[in-house]
């Protein structure tokens, strides 16, 4: 009997792996239908017919909607309850991150990560193990990720929205939990800072700091032009503007060790000998950890391998990388986010 139970459990686990993509794409469907916002804005739970009548595309196949909602309830994203003989749907706690208009909304990340083109490199995972040059992204889409973004403005916008989404999540935790890292800083450059969302959080929390976002021209072109943030276009491999501190959020994981050392050396040149530092916001892997984010961090490591040729790093790998770039020391602080904060001291 135990053997049968083990077989059933193992087969069920494998089937769930096989159809693992379904949860991502049903989640995408929920976002596209705006289900969380419709229920949130109603102020109460809703029947299927009420929900159906408010969907953006009409007419609606209510049987199909019922089946999608049944799956979303099973995912524990939505709730269902019988009230006065009617089945009504509400929001489970994770669904609040699908509600637009607050700083922790994750819709931008969902739409980018589940985009057909951005998922394509995963189909080339095996090819990435061949030892041949080129990333899975290049094999799937014919160019590297940076060239692709420059050539496809609509995808670049999707990507930038996801990065801005991620920045709001991370920076909220960073400012609240280790704002002291900005003590004594009057100027800061966010290298690879996208459209400026991350550094804007710093500018608002610490108005005395003059903040600059530094990124590639096609990225800066999409910046909304925040009054608190100065925008500069350029190439971090060639030059980094001078400041008391350099910040890089989710940048070094895009690159291999050799390129990271080059970037870190450019950062070292940009900060003053006295009090200068580099603030790295990136994942610190601990594969033995039972932390809820461990699987996510390992997934992102594969994602970097596929898309950029980069990697997520363990604490020991960060220590070696920073040392090899000629820095004198570093400090790692965990925050309530997927990433940690690494302060690197060049002098």
Curated annotation (Swiss-Prot):
Catalytic activity, reaction form: norcoclaurine + S-adenosyl-L-methionine = coclaurine + S-adenosyl-L-homocysteine + H(+)
Entry keyword set: Methyltransferase, S-adenosyl-L-methionine, Transferase
Pathway: Alkaloid biosynthesis; (S)-reticuline biosynthesis; (S)-reticuline from (S)-norcoclaurine: step 1/4
Active site: 253
Superkingdom, natural source: Eukaryota
InterPro entries in the record: COMT-like (IPR016461), O_MeTrfase_dom (IPR001077), Plant_O-MeTrfase_dimerisation (IPR012967), SAM-dependent_MTases_sf (IPR029063), WH-like_DNA-bd_sf (IPR036388), WH_DNA-bd_sf (IPR036390)
Residues the record lists as binding S-adenosyl-L-methionine: 192, 215, 235-236, 249
Taxonomic lineage from the root: Eukaryota, Viridiplantae, Streptophyta, Embryophyta, Tracheophyta
Gene Ontology terms for molecular function: (RS)-norcoclaurine 6-O-methyltransferase activity; O-methyltransferase activity; protein dimerization activity
GO BP annotations, alphabetical order: methylation
Known partners and oligomeric status: Homodimer.
Function: Catalyzes the transfer of the S-methyl group of S-adenosyl-L-methionine (AdoMet) to the 6-hydroxyl group of norcoclaurine to form coclaurine.
Annotated protein name in UniProt: (RS)-norcoclaurine 6-O-methyltransferase
EC number: 2.1.1.128
Pfam family, one: Dimerisation
Homology family: Belongs to the class I-like SAM-binding methyltransferase superfamily. Cation-independent O-methyltransferase family. COMT subfamily.
């Amino acid at each position: 009997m135990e053997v049968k139970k083990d077989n059933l459990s193992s087969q069920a686990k494998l089937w769930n792996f096989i159809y693992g993509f379904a949860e991502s794409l049903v989640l995408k469907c929920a976002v596209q239908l705006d289900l969380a916002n419709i229920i949130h804005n109603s102020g109460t739970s809703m029947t299927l017919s009420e929900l159906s009548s408010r969907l953006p595309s009409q007419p609606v196949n209510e049987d199909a909607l019922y089946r999608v909602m049944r799956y979303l309830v099973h995912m524990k994203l939505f709730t269902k309850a019988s009230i006065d003989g009617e089945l009504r749907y509400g929001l489970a706690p994770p669904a609040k991150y699908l509600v637009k208009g607050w700083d922790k909304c994750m819709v931008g990340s969902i739409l980018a990560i589940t985009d057909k083109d951005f998922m394509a490199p995963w189909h080339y995972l095996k090819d990435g193990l061949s030892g041949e040059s080129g990333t899975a992204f290049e094999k799937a889409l014919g160019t590297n990720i940076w060239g692709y973004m420059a050539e496809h403005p609509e995808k670049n916008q999707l990507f930038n929205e996801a990065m801005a989404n991620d920045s709001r999540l991370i920076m909220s935790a960073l400012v609240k939990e280790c704002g002291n890292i900005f003590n004594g800083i009057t100027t800061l450059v966010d290298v690879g800072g996208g459209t400026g969302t991350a550094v804007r959080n710093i500018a608002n929390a610490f108005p005395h700091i003059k903040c600059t976002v530094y990124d590639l021209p096609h990225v800066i072109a999409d910046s909304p032009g925040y009054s608190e943030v100065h925008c500069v276009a350029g190439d971090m491999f060639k030059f980094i503007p001078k400041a008391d501190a350099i910040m890089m959020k989710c940048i070094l994981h895009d690159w291999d060790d050799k390129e990271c050392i080059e970037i870190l050396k450019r950062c070292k040149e940009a900060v003053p000998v006295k009090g200068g530092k580099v603030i790295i916001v990136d994942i610190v892997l601990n594969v033995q950890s039972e932390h809820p984010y461990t699987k996510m961090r390992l997934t992102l490591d594969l994602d970097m391998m596929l898309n950029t040729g980069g990697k997520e790093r363990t604490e020991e790998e960060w220590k070696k990388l920073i040392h090899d770039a000629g820095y004198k020391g570093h400090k790692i602080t965990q925050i309530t986010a997927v990433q940690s904060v690494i302060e690197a001291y060049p002098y």
